[in-house]
Curated annotation (Swiss-Prot):
Taxonomic placement: Eukaryota, Viridiplantae, Streptophyta, Embryophyta, Tracheophyta
Designated gene of the protein: ndhG
Function text: NDH shuttles electrons from NAD(P)H:plastoquinone, via FMN and iron-sulfur (Fe-S) centers, to quinones in the photosynthetic chain and possibly in a chloroplast respiratory chain. The immediate electron acceptor for the enzyme in this species is believed to be plastoquinone. Couples the redox reaction to proton translocation, and thus conserves the redox energy in a proton gradient.
GO cellular component: chloroplast thylakoid membrane; plastid
Predominant subcellular localization, coarse grouping: plastid
Naturally occurring in which organism (per UniProt): Oryza sativa subsp. japonica (Rice)
Family according to the record: Belongs to the complex I subunit 6 family.
Protein name according to UniProt: NAD(P)H-quinone oxidoreductase subunit 6, chloroplastic
Protein location: Plastid, Chloroplast thylakoid membrane
Length: 176
């Protein structure tokens, strides 16, 4: 999106703030239905960031796949869970919660130290997509494939990992 600087910064700050609030809602809300709706809010904010980065195809895929399918699947699985099970548990902090919190705090900090030191040149091992498009011998579907294999390789792979984790989580919740 070609927005003036201050408007772009305001949208990024607003999206980040709502993303953090939604993430806290996913983790801290005791009602699983509200937690699932908070997850939907987080996924919508992530698609807003993709729109701000001019990555419209990934934003639409994010909305359709995650908000439209995965989040609905999670809410569907949560609706099958008996509500009285969640209200009986009054133990708010356990050792497992402490371990989970430690892991959730350590992973972002390790990523923040690892990502800047990584050479990302190897990811773009193919020719650039604009060089291929200049040939004019390909149609729109091939252009989308080329963009996914070059420009959007890293976001596409991250989205596929998130999709896999969401699917495993939904299956686990449905089994319980």
């Amino acid at each position: 999106m070609d927005l003036p600087g201050p408007i772009h910064e305001i949208l990024v700050l607003f999206g980040g703030f709502v993303l953090l609030l939604g993430g806290l809602g996913v983790v801290l809300l005791t009602n699983p239905t509200f937690s699932a709706f908070s997850l939907g809010l987080v996924l919508v904010c992530i698609s807003l960031f993709y729109i701000l980065l001019n990555s419209y195809f990934v934003a639409v895929a994010q909305l359709l796949i995650y908000v439209g399918a995965i989040n609905v699947l999670i809410i569907f699985a949560v609706m099958f869970v008996n509500g009285s099970e969640w209200s009986k548990d009054k133990n708010f902090w356990t050792i497992g919660d402490g371990f989970t919190s430690l892991v959730c705090i350590t992973i972002p900090f390790s990523l923040m130290t690892t990502i800047p030191d990584t050479s990302w040149y190897g990811i773009l091992w193919t020719t650039r997509s604009n060089q291929i498009v200049e040939q004019g011998l390909i149609n729109n579907v091939q252009q989308i494939g080329i963009h996914l294999a070059t420009d959007f390789y890293l976001p596409f792979e991250l989205i596929s990992i998130i999709l896999l984790v969401s699917l495993i989580g939904a299956i686990t919740m449905a089994r319980q």
